[in-house]
Amino acid sequence: MAARQSEIVQTGFGQVEVHRWGPGGRPLVLLHAAATGPKAYAPLAERLAEAGWQCLVPALHGYGNSRVPGAATAVEAHAAIAIWLAEVSGARALVGHSMGGLAGLLAAPSVALDRLVLFEPILFDALDPEADADLIAAEAEMAAEMQRHLADGRDEDAVRVFVEVWNDTPWADLPEAARARLTAQAAGVVADTQATGGVTIAPEIWTAAPPTTLIHGDRSPEIARRMVAGAMRHLPRAAVTPLSGVGHMGPLMRTGPVAEAILAALP
């Protein structure tokens, strides 16, 4: 088992909490999803480290001790952290999950990457406004419901709505400690949900992306699979890896097959 090391780094744009597995391997940046954090990715990071990678998992803006006060949006702050870590570590490969996949795609043109691996990135701009209209409307209503609950002081209900749509485990089946942790993050989860929904991806972002592998599971929400399909239309050098029996939280819940897919995609 690869030992985890962590540190808080003061940068020119804020402070970043970084967790590291496998300090002797080739550097690989791994960006987490909303409502999670670096420690949740320990099993996946250990698998990647055992395969010879130094897995670097930053806490994105607002998570742990990471703060980027000057960013215009949360998503820009997440991308700034990804760019910084890839640059200082010399990483030539980046893996992103969900919101972390969006941040990774936005960061990619600013760093010298040989490979980008995205597990169900949140890419609303890749959806077809007509063909995916019902899915877009349902997601917008979910975000609005989350905001209403948060405004009324019902933090648990706000994050429960999110979990019931995007997580593989129903809210009632989560351990009490997990529900408490998620409830404490409600404001940040709502903010991330709103921020990711409003991102427009410039054409040059798509065209500048390095060779990219998109991974998706057959148990994920339909909108996640449609985002992957849309991204395939925009990315000039992309391949897709479907996984059977895997949902949107596969990097946390089905670490084995997800790790195998990531390792197969890495150079």
Region roles according to the model:
Residues 12-67:
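Conserved HGGG/HGGXW glycine-rich cap/lid loop of the alpha/beta-hydrolase fold
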Residues 36, 98-101:
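Active-site loop->helix "elbow" adjoining a glycine-rich segment at hydrolase catalytic centers
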Residues 50, 54-95, 99, 260:
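Active-site loop/oxyanion-hole signature of alpha/beta-hydrolase fold enzymes
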Residues 59-64, 122, 244-247:
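Short beta-to-alpha linker loops that shape the active-site pocket of alpha/beta-hydrolase fold enzymes
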Residues 105-149:
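Flexible "cap/lid" loop of the alpha/beta hydrolase fold
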Residues 151-190:
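Conserved alpha/beta-hydrolase catalytic His-Asp/Glu region
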Residues 177-233, 242:
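Conserved serine/cysteine hydrolase catalytic core
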Residues 243-256:
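Catalytic histidine-centered segment of alpha/beta-hydrolase-like enzymes
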